[in-house]
Regions:
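Non-catalytic, usually N-terminal nucleic-acid engagement modules in DNA/RNA processing proteins
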Residues: 1-78
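Catalytic cores of enzyme domains
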Residues: 37, 74-75, 80-260
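N-terminal and secondary-structure boundary signal
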Residues: 1-10, 15, 31, 41, ...
């Protein structure tokens, strides 16, 4: 295993303004940590048999922009983050290939449209589980991957490589506080309040909601990740008082006015 290669990738991620990167050996997918586990056909070596290590990169979505969701503002942020992730993942795979280490990039999404997700709510690879196995965080009741720096407000992409790279440890202590803000804020009741994986998102309900917002040019929804109290980004933006989202305090009226203003333009 090459510590030098690992550091080279971490340095490259810093150059690409990617704040989160983690490494997981492909064998971790064959060692179930909970049930139900990842089916064999969704594991890295079933997709790219040469895989020895999965590199996961993560980019945050800015909390103050997310707070306007659903809106054209968050819609554009989501698109921008996704594009940056895909380009960066592809570039990292090219660097590894140039070192004679067979590697491929896995895009952040693996579906053509929301209508497809309504029929079959699965992608061919789960970046959330990859991020979990690469030590970037663990699951919350909202079924999202919670990270220490950004809570669930992160998008992920992955690189499969034939290189043996020293792994990062899986985070054992749960980050989710079981506050239920995500459950209570979901407009389609897609979360049942049980901890993952016993409690699973109603993906069809979520997809129907996303499709409706997409027709108005203001998808995705984002409410369950907006209200999550976990993440160092809350301290950065002085968003640690969760009452600001309930409307119970006049102290935060200026924020609600700002969000309403943004939501009033650019979509239907």
């Amino acid at each position: 295993m090459s510590l030098a290669l690992k550091q080279k990738i971490i340095t490259k991620c810093a150059e690409l303004d990617i704040p989160l990167v983690g490494f997981a050996p492909a064998r971790r997918w064959d060692e179930p940590l909970f049930e139900p586990w990842i089916p064999e056909e969704f594991r890295p070596q079933s997709i790219f048999p040469e895989t020895r290590t999965v590199i996961v990169i993560g980019l945050p979505v800015s909390l103050p922009i997310l707070e306007t969701a659903p809106s054209i503002y968050y819609h554009e942020l989501y698109r921008t983050v996704n594009t940056h992730l895909d380009v960066s993942g592809y570039r990292i795979s090219l660097i590894l290939n140039s070192l004679q280490l067979p590697s491929i990039w896995i895009p952040r999404d693996g579906y053509g449209s929301i209508s497809i997700l309504k029929e079959r709510p699965l992608a061919f690879f789960s970046h959330r589980h990859a991020a979990f196995l690469a030590g970037l965080g663990n699951f919350g009741i909202n079924n999202m991957l919670l990270t220490e720096k950004y809570g669930p407000r992160v998008r992920f992409a992955s690189i499969f490589t034939a290189a043996d790279i020293p792994p990062d440890p899986v985070i054992q202590n749960p980050l989710c506080t079981s506050c239920m803000l995500c459950v209570n804020s979901c407009p389609v009741k897609a979360l049942d309040g049980r901890k993952y994986p016993k409690g699973l998102t109603d993906k069809k309900a979520c997809a129907i909601r996303s499709e409706a917002l997409s027709k108005r040019y203001i998808s995705p929804c984002g409410l369950c990740i907006k209200v999550c109290p976990v993440g160092g980004d809350r301290k950065l933006y002085a968003r640690e008082d969760m009452r600001m989202y309930t409307g119970d305090s006049m102290e935060y009226e200026k924020y609600h006015k700002a969000w309403k203003h943004v939501r009033s333009y650019g979509g239907r």
